[in-house]
Swiss-Prot record:
This is Nucleoporin Nup35. GO terms for cellular component: nuclear membrane; nuclear pore central transport channel; nuclear pore nuclear basket. The keyword Nucleus applies. It is found in: Nucleus, Nuclear pore complex. Interacts with Nup154. The gene is Nup35.
Length: 331
């Protein structure tokens, strides 16, 4: 037996050089042995360690290590539970067929990155689905001519009726002047009513009956014993009361009709009578010259400085005796 010296190796140095090199650098697929990783955030995940001896594993252990390696790569691809040998082999054959030996090419957080990317894709699809109803709404919105900015019916009739004091029938440009010019005449026409349908001899009786509706300001009778007359009330409310007697029977045997007066000659009677009077009147006199403001203010300032004489102020006498007294006493 050879004696043993301190510092000398037991075996020859050349036979044990492979103990100091990782097996995956030498291309040896049998040096991978799995063991549990207690620091892994996921359950059922195995870590990879490399054996120091190329021949220290049995064939059964090699098969088990290969299955564990495939299970590891399948779990990193998205599996969260324990996977069998058949399912892990299928997943490994689809994704990691070219990484049977060597160190792992995926980190511990690669699966977390894949999971974080997947909800973003789902959210992107959800946004596309949400945008599609908006696009259909916009298309239906632009198909309506009343809302399109360049369409002929650019102003909606309902909005015009709500926002415009002229009503929905008045156009924004053309109908404005007509409505303004006829505004005063329409107000006068609200006070006038037309009463018709009565016999010519019952005109006074019908007029007496309509006095209960309000104060009658003016009456225009029909020519040649006609069966109508125009009555003007002092207010719109009184004329509305008279309109309630339309198609009503008066005095038991006379049915009358009442409506708004549409005869422009009657409605504009006051305006027509007032226009000639204005034309016949005196011509306008030429305006007088405007006094300068500076002169007027100067005169007012001088009046304040003038002292008005008062009667009660004593005056010095200028008689002969007064002059003699001044010479004697030196006053």
């Amino acid at each position: 037996m050879e004696p043993m010296n301190l510092g000398s190796p037991v075996n020859s140095p050349g036979s044990n050089q492979t103990q100091y090199l990782p097996p995956f650098l030498l291309g040896d697929p049998q040096g991978i042995t799995p063991h549990k990783n207690t620091l892994s955030p996921k359950t059922g995940r195995s870590n990879i360690s490399f054996a120091t001896s190329p021949g220290g594993s049995s064939p059964h252990e090699l098969n088990r290590s290969a299955l564990s390696t495939r299970t590891l790569f399948a779990a990193q691809g998205g599996a969260h539970t324990a996977v069998g040998a058949n399912s892990s082999t299928t997943a490994h054959g689809q994704t990691h067929s070219h990484h049977q030996t060597g160190p792992p090419t995926q980190g511990l957080f690669d699966s977390l990155r894949e999971q974080s990317v997947t909800p973003k894709k789902k959210n992107h699809l959800g946004m596309l689905q949400l945008q599609s109803p908006n696009q259909s709404y916009q298309s239906s919105y632009h198909t309506n001519d009343s809302f399109a900015p360049g369409a002929p019916n650019a102003i909606n009739a309902s909005m015009r009726a709500l926002c415009s004091p002229l009503g929905a029938t008045a156009s924004p440009a053309g109908g404005l002047g007509t409505s303004v010019t006829t505004g005063g005449n329409s107000r006068l026409s609200d006070f006038w009513v037309t009463i018709f349908g009565f016999p010519p001899g019952a005109g006074s009786m019908v007029l007496q009956h309509f006095t209960v509706c309000g104060t009658i300001v003016d009456v225009v009778h029909a020519p040649q014993n006609g069966n109508w007359m125009y009555v003007r009330y002092s207010s719109r409310i009184e004329s509305d009361k008279a309109l309630n007697y339309n198609e009503k029977i008066i005095a038991g045997n006379v049915m009358v009709g009442v409506s708004r007066c549409t005869d422009r000659s009657v409605i504009d009677k006051e305006n027509i009578g007032s226009v000639p009077n204005a034309e016949i009147g005196d011509p306008p006199t030429s305006p007088s010259a405007i006094r300068p403001f500076s002169q007027q203010s100067y005169k007012l300032a001088r009046k304040d400085n003038i002292i008005s004489p008062q009667k009660d102020v004593p005056q010095k006498s200028s008689g002969l005796m007064d002059k003699a007294m001044d010479l004697i006493f030196g006053w």
